[in-house]
A protein has these predicted regions:
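Conserved small/polar residues in nucleotide/adenosyl-binding loops
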Residues: 239-242
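Divalent metal-coordination and catalytic microenvironments
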Residues: 30, 40, 77, 134, ...
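Helix-loop-beta element that forms the nucleotide-linked donor phosphate-binding surface
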Residues: 108-122
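A short helix->loop->beta-strand "cap" motif at the edges of active sites that frequently abuts
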Residues: 94-96, 221-224
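Beta-strand-turn-beta hairpins that frame and shape the catalytic cleft
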Residues: 15-18, 32-37, 126-135, 161-167
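Active-site environment of divalent metal-dependent phosphoester hydrolases
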Residues: 79-83, 105-107, 125-128, 142-144, ...
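Active-site-proximal loop/helix segments of hydrolase catalytic cores
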Residues: 86, 141-220
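Pre-active-site segment of Zn-dependent metallo-hydrolases
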Residues: 2-17, 23, 27-78, 85-90, ...
Length: 242
């Protein structure tokens, strides 16, 4: 896929504008009120415990080394295409704070991230840091990294707010009434990032078809909608749309 040349200096500028860089799949950078948030970062060559599978078909538009100073890393759940050990280890010696769902802290501390740098949250909990508000909200999905210990950690969608802006990130989720509930309580949103690229009838409960993502954007009262969960890793089986 074509990649736009990114001006990191302009992206880092602290002003009242909302700046976004999509890194492919569900990873993106967010500059809100001058604070830099990195969401579900995966920079490895494969989103799998075995590097032969779910391989990246192109490099991200920015390398780890090119990233600006990251204030926060936000994680939706612990699947390999959203929580990447090698990427997390890059931040061991940095001061980045991690915002994660319940149970995910254990993964990070196992990878030598200091516990005091990690904030774990349950659905509907709120945390405020440096002018930025993080709200953990529901998602319809599941978790687990080995197929033996499913659903021992929580999965979540997220709201990120400043005084001027508000965004919503679905994480991985099937379509259900939680989008309407979130939209009624916290909408409208300047931008919503919605799972739209893993559509298959077998996975309807845990991923959205594009038309369902459009309905979710409507439920959330989105001003802008960015479809995510596509465009970076080898695709699996899809249901053809007619």
């Amino acid at each position: 896929l074509p990649a736009h040349q990114t001006d990191i200096t302009a992206f880092r500028a602290r002003d009242e504008s909302l700046k976004i860089i999509w890194l492919g799949h569900s990873s993106f950078l967010l500059n809100m009120a001058g604070r830099i948030v990195l969401v579900d970062p995966v920079f490895s060559q494969a989103a799998s415990p075995i590097s032969l599978f779910v391989r990246r078909f192109q490099d991200p538009p920015i390398s780890l080394q090119m990233l600006p100073t990251i204030d926060f890393i936000l994680i939706s759940h612990d699947h390999y295409d959203h929580l990447d050990m090698k990427t997390i280890e890059f931040f061991v010696e940095r001061e980045t704070r991690f915002i994660v769902p319940l149970g995910v802290k254990n993964h990070l501390t196992g990878w030598e991230i200091a516990a005091e740098r990690i904030t774990e949250m349950d659905w509907w909990e709120t945390a405020i840091f440096s002018e930025i508000t993080f709200i953990a909200t529901p998602a319809q999905h599941f978790s687990g990294r080995d197929g033996i210990h499913p659903n021992e950690t929580l999965w979540a969608s997220w709201i990120v707010q400043s005084a001027q802006h508000s965004i919503f990130f679905s994480g991985d989720s099937g379509y259900d009434e939680h989008f309407q509930t979130i939209g009624d309580q916290y909408g409208p949103f300047d931008v919503v990032f919605l799972d739209s690229g893993q559509y298959n009838e077998r996975w309807r409960e845990v991923h959205m078809f594009p038309r369902e993502a459009m309905q979710a954007a409507h439920d959330l009262r989105a001003r802008h909608h960015l479809p995510i969960h596509w465009g970076m890793f080898e695709p699996v089986s899809y249901t053809h749309l007619t």
